[in-house]
């Protein structure tokens, strides 16, 4: 694995700017980019010179992997589904093959079911080829819940942006009081929430905590990801594209050769991602 910062390029202007500033338009110089969002893989085609020449979203890979199942979506890129509580039911996780092992992108929540699935995958997949790096696209517990367990098991580094890492650390430190106590009630009341709904909010956060959806404790150190940084993994260059809105400093990974963007929650094809 090789990491190198680069100067702004036309690719960054095309991909990064349009990713953040144009709703529904994701442009690639090759004019046909597959975008891997957190629920589906989809493709969109757009003429860079004529922005009216758009096509509806299509899904080149229709079959979603079952929970705990791994499928290959591109050379050296594998797609894994992990369970999460609630109606969304699953989170996408990615495995990137390197010369000396594997990288994991995002982790699933911190509960027994997900831990057991990872332990099975460790035995089946990573006995001879260990995990050499973990990337968390952003701070939310369905993406970071197993980060500490994975990094400690393989003694591998965690890669995140600074804004996501330290926000997660701050939330984890006061997770017990921020929503369920009087501070949380006062916050929601000032935001306009009816008094009779405050009790339901407290119950909801208590339930989420029991399901592993509270903010986990991250490893004590991390490797910082920055805009336009390039991670070379298994011969593929993955450029870091930073977004915001859904979370403070969300990291997407774009590989021009594979025409593949791992978008985390910055782009969602079904529900609305706050951007």
Residue ranges and their predicted role:
Residues 45-61:
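N-terminal presequences and immediately downstream first alpha-helices
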Residues 113-114, 120-232, 259, 268-270:
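Active-site HxH/HxHxD metal-binding segment of metal-dependent hydrolases
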Residues 3, 8, 24, 29-32, ...:
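Short hydrophobic alpha-helical segments enriched in small aliphatic residues
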Residues 51, 73-80, 207-214, 234-236:
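Short Pro/Gly-enriched beta-strand edge/turn motifs at strand-loop
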Residues 67-129, 253-263, 269:
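Conserved beta-strand hairpin/beta-sheet module of binuclear metal-dependent hydrolase folds
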Residues 102-112, 213-222, 230-232, 237-275:
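Metallo-beta-lactamase
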């Amino acid at each position: 694995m090789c990491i190198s910062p680069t100067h702004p390029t036309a690719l960054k202007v095309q991909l990064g700017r349009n990713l953040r500033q144009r709703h529904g338009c994701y442009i690639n110089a090759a004019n046909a980019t597959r975008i891997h969002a957190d629920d589906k893989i989809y493709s969109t085609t757009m003429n860079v010179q004529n922005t009216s020449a758009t096509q509806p979203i299509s899904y080149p890979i229709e079959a979603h992997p079952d929970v705990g199942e791994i499928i290959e979506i591109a050379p050296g890129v594998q797609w894994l589904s992990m369970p999460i509580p609630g109606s969304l039911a699953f989170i996408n996780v990615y495995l990137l093959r390197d010369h000396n092992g594997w990288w994991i992108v995002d982790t699933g929540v911190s509960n027994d079911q997900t831990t057991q699935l990872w332990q099975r995958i460790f035995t089946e997949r990573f006995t001879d080829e260990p995990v050499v790096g973990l990337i968390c696209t952003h701070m939310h517990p369905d993406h970071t819940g197993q980060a500490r367990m994975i990094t400690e098991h393989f003694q591998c580094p965690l890669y995140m942006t600074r804004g996501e890492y330290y926000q997660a650390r701050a939330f984890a430190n006061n997770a017990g009081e921020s929503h369920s106590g009087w501070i949380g009630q006062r916050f929601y009341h000032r935001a306009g929430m009816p008094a009779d709904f405050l009790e339901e909010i407290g119950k909801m956060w208590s339930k989420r905590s029991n399901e592993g959806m509270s903010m986990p404790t991250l490893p004590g150190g991390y490797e910082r990801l920055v805009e336009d940084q390039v991670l070379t993994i298994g011969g593929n260059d993955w450029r870091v594209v930073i977004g915001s809105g859904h979370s403070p400093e969300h990291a997407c990974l774009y590989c021009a050769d594979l025409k593949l963007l791992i978008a985390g929650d910055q782009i969602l094809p079904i529900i609305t991602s706050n951007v």
